[in-house]
C-alpha cells in the first residue's frame, strides 16, 4: 500500500463518517451554507440540470448532495434487453466474472461471494458479468435501476470505510468486499441479478426506496422484499457516496457496448450492455 491508503487503516473511519454525517444533516443556516457553497466551488458544481437551481434552496448539505434532476434530464435507453448505467460517473471496471473473481484494478481482483457476503450467491454469479461505476463528488448521487426487476432481498454488510478512488482500488486488497455496502438482489428476465451500493470514507449513509436510510450495525442484516422496478426507476441514494456495482448472471449472456471500458464517463440511463436472452 502507499502512504495515502496506509494512513486510512489507522484513522477512526467510523467516527469520521459519523461526524461528517451529523454535519451534512445539519439545517443550521451557517453550517449548511458554508458546506454547500464550499463544496460547489471546490468541485465546480453546476445546477443547470437540477430541479432546484439556487444553492439557497437546499435544507441541508445532504439535501444538496442528493439533489434531484429535472424531468427528462437523462434519457433511459429503451431497448428491451438493454442494461443501463445505474448512475452518473466513471466506469472503474467491467467485464466477465471468471471463476468467482471480479477485476478491481490492474493486477488485483476479488471474490464475488465476499462482495455479496453469501457463498451461495457467489456460486450463482461465479461466471457472470459485472460493471463498477464510481460516482465522483460532483456527480448526481442517486442510483437507478439498470434493468427491469423485482427486488427480493437486501443485505446490509458492515465493513471498513476506505475512500474509493483509483489509488485505493489499486492498493487496497478486496476493497469493495471489505467496505460497508448494501447488496440488492433482484429477480429478472434472465434470473437473479444484483446492484451493490458500496460506502466509503465520510459516506454519511445509504438509503433505498425499499429500506429507507440504512442504520449501521455490527452484523449482517437481511430483509426480504417484493417490490417491482422498471429500468430507470430510482433505487436509492448515497449521502456523500461512492460506488455502484451491477452484477449479472451467466444466463444474461452480457454483450458490452464497445464504447464502454475502464475510464469511460457514463450517465444514468446510458446503455452499458445488451442481454442476449
Swiss-Prot record:
It is a peripheral membrane protein. It is an enzyme of class 4 (lyase). The active site is at 88 (charge relay system), 144 (charge relay system), 242 (charge relay system), 242 (schiff-base intermediate with substrate). One of its GO terms (cellular component) is plasma membrane. It is found in: Cell membrane. It catalyses: a 1,2-diacyl-sn-glycero-3-phospho-L-serine + H(+) = a 1,2-diacyl-sn-glycero-3-phosphoethanolamine + CO2. Its main location: membrane. Belongs to the phosphatidylserine decarboxylase family. PSD-B subfamily. Prokaryotic type I sub-subfamily. This is Phosphatidylserine decarboxylase proenzyme. The lineage of its organism: Bacteria, Pseudomonadati, Pseudomonadota, Gammaproteobacteria, Moraxellales.
